[in-house]
Curated annotation (Swiss-Prot):
Belongs to the spermidine/spermine synthase family. InterPro entries: PABS, PABS_CS, SAM-dependent_MTases_sf, Spermi_synthase, Spermidine_synt_N, Spermidine_synt_N_sf. Its EC number is 2.5.1.16. GO terms for biological process: spermidine biosynthetic process. Gene3D superfamilies: Spermidine synthase, tetramerisation domain, Vaccinia Virus protein VP39. Spermidine binds at residues 63, 87, 158-161. This is Polyamine aminopropyltransferase. The active site is at 158 (proton acceptor). Homodimer or homotetramer.
Length: 283
């Protein structure tokens, strides 16, 4: 759009995280304001409604942590649902697995996909063309409601922070519907916000999943572009989770293509729950 550089900031409770660079794209879609900026250090970055979503520099911290703990523990052919994920990073990580039979990506805002393909094509690349992928421009909540019981083996909730059009993706009723459409041994994997910047939302997510599913586990790591830098991902199942019992040969293969995730990283990340979160969950 222009060669003039400017600061773009995300504000949160009296703090801010900003990037300085050239604005490559700016538009208000039916659902949200979309900005793409190019920064010297983080590369191209995507902001939705004033919140940083991803950047080329640190997106693998997020996408690898969301996908691989779940998919590396699945042994059989699987149907996968991605709710959100319009930047393509979750799709890219999913298509690394030959055992995935089908991927449904449900994104409410088609503009996010279009813009990501044009300005952030380094994220997903050819993954957009994988024959197993079907893209649906739809409301994720409504998609889940109309899906038959036990249909998906893995569900990824790759959504933005709570907002007017995404609040229901964090609700107890929505997680309950996800449990209904999962296969008996299926896994729900969701980004579960920051235990620091979004502590109350984080606690509510963990409590809901603990109440609905037989077992849930949360891992913590870093996404530098997000408020406070620390983030979380939670994995839940109606049967015993086997997140530490991966197929060794497959893990070795997947690790070679990852920048952040490996089994040692994962095992440590599942042991990083801050004690203040432990206390609130036990109260």
């Amino acid at each position: 759009m222009t060669d003039i550089t400017t600061w773009i900031d995300e504000y949160h409770k009296g703090s801010r995280f900003g990037l300085n660079g050239k604005i490559l794209f700016k538009k208000t879609s039916k659902y949200q304001e979309i900005i793409v900026i190019e920064n010297e250090y983080y590369g191209k970055a995507l902001m939705l409604d004033g919140c940083w979503m991803t950047s080329l520099k640190d997106e693998k911290y997020y996408h690898e942590c969301l996908v691989h703990p779940a998919l590396s523990s699945i042994d059989e052919k699987s149907n996968v649902l991605i709710i959100g994920g319009g930047d393509g990073g979750t799709v890219r990580e999913c298509v690394k697995y030959s055992k995935i039979s089908k991927i449904d990506l449900v994104e409410i805002d088609e503009e996010v996909i279009k813009i990501s393909k044009k300005f952030l094509k380094e994220i997903a690349g050819e993954a957009w063309n994988d024959k197993r992928l079907e893209i649906h421009i739809d409301d994720g909540v409504k998609w889940v409601e109309k899906t038959k019981d036990n249909f998906y083996d893995v569900i990824f909730i790759d959504c933005s922070d709570p907002s007017e059009f995404s609040n229901l993706l964090f609700s107890h009723s929505f997680y309950k519907e996800c449990e209904r459409i999962l296969a008996p041994s299926g896994i729900l994997a969701t980004q579960s916000e920051s235990p620091e910047s979004f502590k109350n939302i984080h606690i509510n997510i963990l409590k809901s999943l603990k109440n609905i599913f037989k077992v849930s586990e949360t891992m913590y790591s870093f996404v530098p572009i997000y408020p406070s830098g620390i983030w979380s991902w939670t994995f839940a199942s109606s049967e015993d989770l086997s997140l530490s019992k991966q197929n060794y040969d497959e893990v070795v293969k997947i690790e070679k293509g990852c920048e952040i995730w490996n089994l040692n990283f994962q095992n440590a990340a599942f042991k990083m729950m801050p004690n203040k979160i432990v206390k609130e969950l036990d109260s």
